[in-house]
């Protein structure tokens, strides 16, 4: 079966969504055609993150007709994990906010290692062989030890899981994904 893509259509939808987001928060890093990170550090003390997230969702749905999911967390890696749960688990109504250490710890304990951004099948197998099975397990390992035995990318991931923002993109608190199926 062969499907045709309409890149101009996707780009138009993406541009409209990114414009809405940039109106809500000028610090935006467009990661891909369907993902963006917003830097909410300047707003963190001034806004309610729950209201902000639902306002983003509502505006994008009302103005553009596209459903989105939002993950808010101290680092990009944590935000992507939060976003994945927001998208996949209907109990969260498309929004997951990881703002307290206790909540983050609980969240990481329930997250299988293969769900982490950048960890594929081969790396999952290697980590499971040394008894690292969850995001929490990985977050408890010394990041330098991981860097010495694996690579700098995984070392950064460990630091991000610990709440230390170190991905080369600007520090962000919100991760948004547009479900591809909603474009069709």
Kindly label every feature range from the protein language model:
Residues 43-44, 73-77, 103, 112-113, ...:
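Short acidic/polar capping segments at secondary-structure boundaries
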Residues 93-110:
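A short, charged helix-loop
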Residues 40-43, 178, 184:
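Hydrophobic pocket-lining residues within nucleotide cofactor-binding pockets
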Residues 2, 115, 123-176, 181-182:
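DNA-contacting surface of Y-family translesion DNA polymerases
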Residues 67, 110, 178-179:
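Proline-centered helix-kink/hinge sites
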């Amino acid at each position: 079966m062969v499907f045709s893509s309409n890149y101009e259509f996707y780009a138009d939808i993406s541009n409209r969504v990114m414009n809405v987001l940039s109106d809500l928060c000028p610090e935006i890093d467009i990661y891909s055609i369907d993902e963006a990170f917003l830097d909410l550090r300047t707003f963190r003390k001034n806004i309610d993150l729950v209201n902000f997230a639902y306002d983003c969702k509502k505006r994008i749905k009302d103005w553009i007709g596209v459903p989105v999911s939002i993950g808010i967390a101290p680092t990009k890696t944590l935000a992507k994990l939060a976003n994945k749960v927001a998208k996949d688990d209907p109990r969260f109504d498309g929004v997951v906010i990881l703002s307290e250490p206790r909540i983050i710890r609980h969240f990481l304990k329930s997250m299988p290692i293969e769900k982490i951004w950048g960890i594929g099948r081969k790396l999952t197998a290697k980590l499971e062989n040394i008894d690292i099975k969850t995001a929490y397990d990985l977050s408890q390992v010394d990041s330098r030890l991981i860097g010495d035995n694996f690579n700098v990318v995984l070392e950064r991931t460990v630091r991000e899981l610990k709440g230390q923002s170190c991905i080369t993109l600007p520090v962000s608190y919100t991760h948004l994904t547009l479900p591809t199926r909603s474009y069709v």
